[in-house]
């Protein structure tokens, strides 16, 4: 694991040496090219089976998986209920809800740079249950549920990525989860913990610090949120009946002016920068469908990725456009998804054709991030 990731750092050192050469006319001009080397898969673990949170790394060039990569790199566990991973600059940030911890890791080696105890950083009232994060302007912005004394609202905390100190906090809506940045603002999906009484989208103006609440009848249980162009798309889990059948789940679009519309069904989503890909597997439904929403045309098509038993996460490589679906494997004893078993990940090209299957990825898969960077070529 360390060797394959360190080779990337050596490549970048070589690129730096090239750019430091003389500016003679004979010196070839180097072009900056985006590259993608692999994918980190975070699993929340499994509480019933006493399995901690975990990270696996898929190395494209080697065509192999390093399971429990964090533990192998650091000799310790992530802790209970890992929830999210994001890269910003040269670091990875892994959010662990039940431990009130954010692990700051070197992107090339997964070695821990800093363990941020969020209760120590923010206090008992605000630092409970970190959920998701995004990096911008030298800060890591993190959503927190907070404790029961916070008046029903969560917070977003800005944490400096050099000294890892608190910069400021913003009060947002009830049980904030995913967040994204668009048009100089942070948009936050306030899930209300699925109670469907006070869900909303918070909009934080990073210039003024003003927080606005967006409410609409189609905002019922927002969880994940992303940016595509100047618009924001969020995944709403919808509602559940008395038998826990899931209804009304799908992706909604929020325009820069605040208009909210439902665009496509889904229970998981990702974007390649042009389209929104969804898995539509509502709890209690007889079948799973896979949909593609084209943001430019407003049209929806379907596809049928082969080899998926029980999808958990879908993600698009921002460089190659390849689509990855992380799936639970079948429990051979029950025929149901093996929630305490390692997942597997299928790779498809941009046209939806199967490319490769990676075994033994994370247990309890919940979040992924791609190992991307740049290289310089003639």
Describe these PLM feature segments.
Residues 1-40:
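Bacterial Sec-dependent N-terminal signal peptides
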Residues 28-29, 77-86, 123-135, 172-183, ...:
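Repeated scaffold domains used in trafficking and secretory/extracellular systems
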Residues 41-42, 94, 142-143, 188-189, ...:
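Residue position within the beta-strands of beta-propeller blades
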Residues 45-50, 99-101, 146-151, 192-196, ...:
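Short glycine/acidic-enriched loop and turn motifs that connect beta-strands
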Residues 49-137:
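Post-signal peptide N-terminal segment of secreted/secretory-pathway proteins
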Residues 64-77, 111-124, 164-170, 209-216, ...:
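A short beta-strand motif characteristic of beta-propeller blades
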Residues 162-285:
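Acidic, serine/threonine- and glycine-rich low-complexity intrinsically disordered segments
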């Amino acid at each position: 694991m360390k060797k394959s990731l360190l080779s990337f750092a050596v490549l970048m050192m070589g690129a730096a040496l090239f750019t430091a050469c003389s500016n003679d006319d004979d010196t070839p001009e180097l072009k900056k090219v985006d590259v993608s080397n692999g994918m980190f898969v975070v699993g929340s673990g499994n509480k019933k089976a006493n399995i901690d949170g975990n990270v696996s790394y898929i190395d494209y060039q080697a065509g192999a998986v390093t399971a429990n990569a964090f533990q192998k790199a650091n000799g310790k566990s992530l802790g209970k209920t890992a929830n999210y991973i994001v890269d910003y600059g040269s670091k990875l940030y892994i959010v662990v809800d039940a431990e009130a911890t954010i692990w700051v890791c070197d992107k090339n080696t997964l070695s821990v740079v800093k363990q941020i105890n969020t209760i120590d950083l923010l206090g008992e009232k605000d630092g409970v249950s970190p959920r998701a994060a995004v990096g911008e302007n030298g800060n890591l912005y993190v959503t927190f549920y907070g404790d029961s004394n916070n008046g029903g609202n969560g917070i977003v905390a800005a944490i400096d990525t050099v000294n890892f100190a608190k910069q400021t906090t913003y009060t947002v809506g009830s049980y904030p989860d995913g967040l994204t940045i668009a048009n100089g603002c942070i948009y936050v999906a306030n899930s209300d913990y699925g109670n469907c009484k006070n869900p909303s989208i918070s909009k934080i103006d990073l210039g003024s610090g003003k927080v606005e609440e967006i409410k609409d009848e189609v905002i019922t249980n927002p969880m994940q949120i992303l940016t595509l162009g100047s618009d924001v798309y969020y995944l709403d889990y919808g509602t559940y009946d008395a038998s826990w059948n899931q209804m009304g789940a799908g992706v909604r679009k929020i325009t820069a002016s605040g208009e909210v519309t439902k665009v496509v069904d889904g229970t998981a989503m990702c974007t390649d920068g042009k389209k929104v890909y969804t898995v539509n597997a509502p709890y209690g439904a007889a079948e799973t469908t896979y949909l593609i929403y084209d943001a430019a045309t407003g049209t929806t098509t379907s596809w049928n990725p082969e080899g998926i038993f029980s999808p958990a996460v879908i993600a698009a490589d921002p460089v190659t456009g390849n689509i990855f679906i992380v799936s639970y494997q079948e429990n051979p004893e029950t025929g149901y998804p093996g929630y305490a078993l390692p997942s597997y990940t299928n790779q498809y090209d941009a046209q939806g054709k199967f490319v490769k299957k990676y075994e033994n990825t994370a247990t309890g898969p919940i979040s992924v991030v791609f190992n991307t960077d740049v290289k310089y070529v003639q």
